[in-house]
Structures are given as structure tokens and as C-alpha cells.
């Protein structure tokens, strides 16, 4: 499928005021309090009593906001720079995305500590289910009407809500952990699945259902991921995905690290994405700081991000083919990944987790001889992709296992918050590198691979074609690498250019302070989304004018992708579920953070 047949995506409209006019016309300007931010979208505060009505309007307006992109909370109690905003102890925000407008809007509602409840919106957007569960889990905010408001990241027996400001952030602030036999039995009992809790029946009219645990330790679960299957024979009647086993508190960690020292933690979100994880974070921090990086920095960042797109997709390809029964290709794809990592290691000094991007630039300049390494890889990979396509992807057995399996359309994808190859496999031509170019992607020539059926096979083929386009982008970076510095000339560039510290005492002082305490960012909010390896990844940062983030919201693509599983796989066979899980391309750190 080509872009000519796809849904038309208009040019990106940052800070789109059209929706503000529509809202004012419908509800009156007095219903909203506008908040100036550096998020690139209108941010509007509304009263809780009108929240559901306003969100329903946005969902049904002409050119609707079909996707609930994100929903989460903020503990406002210690925030000092609120700039005349509505009084709030806690805030719940709703980030809505319209494909047909190519614009976003954020709605916020203020809550007092004595009345922490907001009506559920699961009847408007089905993917609000998990987001509301996480907000309750992390902040203790209630959502009346929610079908199953329960822990999602933390264990069922957990006490407290970790993202509250009064909840400890370090292990040393807790009592020493011990696991007694009684506590072990309590935890095991809490993990027991009870169908009635999820509205499931144990038997039908003429059959008894079997309930099967797939995971949390199963090779086809691709990580610490558990799915409880309700089976009639081998047919899946329903299922309940169970996540949180890989949760490490990444957003809590961000509140205790400086803006600079949090960069290595971003690598551990999608741990196959490498520097791709650094990019939305440093771009969002640079928006706060007002830093414009040199052109060379943009090109270097794009080149290395595309290298990691390729390494991630190669791992996906090998393991996906292995999931459906072919054992050999994974060894070949790992050989190709090693060739890519040879280039990555030569340039960054590291392999999987380089933590190489910096606020205002990159860690160091490109080494001598980098062009030959890149050229050798660019010449190598296309022929290998041809082999994979011919030998494996055109194989009749693989097609029989994946064509028509776990299919969904564009409307369903948007309702569940699906992005990346999963969305483009339905024919929706929405790739942020084209639709909302960042870091200079508008200067590169490449195509957006699309498919039409939205099934397990199409999701695979889209990623294979994406690797070909990444090679084109890397080749253009290699041939057109600009001259110039690899860091911005800005006071908040961290660390500052080292050469100047040997000549100017002011720069030496700045270097010392920014490395020890960290740079001080202006009080504001910023947001940046990118087209990451598994879909759209973004960082929404709140600065209170300090050396650390007041609130860091990490929105990952894999979280909504797993939430969609029950709606897609009902009525299919267990073997189809394995093919479906492989086609999603997820890692649990990207889900659980």
C-alpha cells in the first residue's frame, strides 16, 4: 500500500488554536483556564463537573480526537511555580490526539486531597482503562464507574501510592525487606486468578472453561508478562493481560536525578532502543532550556537513532520468525545486529545502552574513520533483507501462521492508542518523522512503509521495509554530514564544551556546578514525542525551577499495545496468540517502566 491510498494527514499544527475556538464556542470561554507551556499544544484546565462533557465533545467533534494518547497525574502539593493556575493538590491530565487534524490538546482537572475522584472515561476511549488503573495505583485517585479499578504496576498487596511526593524514593528510606513464610503465602494467594473478579464465567451452556497461565516466565511472552487465558478447548474465549513484573519506578527515579544524570535511565525504558530513548528526553529538556542545537548534532542524532531502529527491528524479525516455528533466521539476524553494534560501539563507545546524547548535543564528536564503517554496513544490509524476504517471509508456512491473524483496522487502532508499525499496517500514514518532523527529519528523503490488512504478517513486513528506509536515511547522513561543533553554545548545555574550561574560570565553574548539582531549568512544562522503534514514545516534563524534574511522565508505545490484546485475540487459537504477541514487538521495560 502507498501513501496515495492512505488517510490524508494535514501539516502539523503546533499550539493549534482552532480547537480552543471550538471549545469556547460550545462551552464558553469562562469554562477554561489556559496554561502557557512549551508543550506545543493548547493546555486547558476545566472543572471536574464539566470534564466528561468536554471530553465527549472532543471525541465526537468533526475531525475528532480519536486517540487518548495519554492520561496520568501530578502531585502538585510541593510545586511552587504555578503561575496563577487553579488551586490543586493533585492534577489529572488528558492528552488527546487527532490524526485528521494532526494536532493535540491537553485537558487538565484540579483535585483537592480531600476529594480525589474523577469520573471514568472508559466509555469514551476504551484504552483509558489501564491508564486510570495506573493513576489510582500511583496516586490513589479514584475513578468512579471504572470496570475494575485495581493495582496494575504494583503487587496487589502493596501499601501506598508511589508517585505521591510523600512516598519514599529510596530503598534506604524503607524498613529492611524480609519474606516470611506467612507473607509468601499471602503473596501467592493474592496472585491467584479468580475469574469472577474479571466478570468471567467458569462454564458455558455446554462446557467448562479452562483457565491457563501463559507466563510470567514463558519464552513467547517476551519478558516477565502474564496472560490468563479463558479457553474452550484451544479457542480463546477471553484473556486478562497482567503486567507490572518489570516495573522499576522510572518516573519516580527522575524526581531524584538531575536533568543530566537521568539520561542513562532513559536507555533502560525500551532497552533495545539505545539512543532512541535519549532523544525525546533531551529534546524536551532543550525546549525547557531554549537550546537550539547545531545542525551537525541533529544529523548525528538521526543517524544513530536509525541505527538503533535497525538493530531493534532485526531482533524483532529473528525472534518473530522463531515464534512461528523457524529456528535458523534468528542466528542470521543476530549476526547482522553485531555488524551494526560494531559501528555503534566505534562511535559511542558502548553497545546496547550508550547514554550518548547530551542536553545541547552529543557526548563527543564522530571518530576518525567512521564513514567507512557506516558505508560497509549500508552496503551490507539491503542484500540481507532481500534474503530474509525471499527465504523466510515468503515461506508458505509462515504466511499460513500469520496472514489474517490478529487483524484490526485503523479505527480500532486509534481507539486503543496503537502507534508505530501496528498503526501503519492498517493503512494509516502516520509517522512522526514525516507528519511532525523533529531534529531535521524534514531534510531527508525516505518513504513511510504502509500495509492494508493490519494483521500479524503486515506488521512484520512494515518493519522490514522500515529497515530499508533507515538505511536510506543513514546513507544520506553519511554523505551530507555537516561541519561544526557537536554541542550547542548555550549556558545550559551539559556538560559545557570542555575546551573552554581550560581557559575561562566562569566556564569551569559552570562545568563543576552542572556536573555536580545539575543545570537549573526554567520553571515550565515541555513535551516531545518521537517515532521510536516500537511506536510513539514521549517525555512530558514539569520543571519547578530546580536542578531536577518535578514530574517526568514517560509515555511508551508498548503499554497500550498490550492493553489491546483481549479485543483482538478473542475467538482465535492459542497458536494465533503466540504469532500475535510476536508481531506486536514489545519489551516489558517499555510497558512497565
From Swiss-Prot:
InterPro entries: NADH_DH_suC, NADH_DH_suCD, NADH_Q_OxRdtase_suD, NADH_quin_OxRdtase_su_C/D-like, NADH_UbQ_OxRdtase_30kDa_su, NADH_UbQ_OxRdtase_49kDa_CS, NDH1_su_D/H, NiFe-Hase_large. It comes from the Bacteria. Keywords: Cell inner membrane, Cell membrane, Membrane, Multifunctional enzyme, NAD, Quinone, Translocase, Transport, Ubiquinone. The keyword tRNA processing does not apply. It holds the Pfam family Complex1_49kDa. GO terms for molecular function: NAD binding; NADH dehydrogenase (ubiquinone) activity; NADH:ubiquinone reductase (non-electrogenic) activity; quinone binding. Its main location: membrane. Residues 208-593 are annotated as: NADH dehydrogenase I subunit D. It is found in: Cell inner membrane. PROSITE patterns: COMPLEX1_49K. Residues 1-184 are annotated as: NADH dehydrogenase I subunit C. PANTHER family: NADH-QUINONE OXIDOREDUCTASE SUBUNIT C_D, NADH-UBIQUINONE OXIDOREDUCTASE 49 KDA SUBUNIT. This is NADH-quinone oxidoreductase subunit C/D.
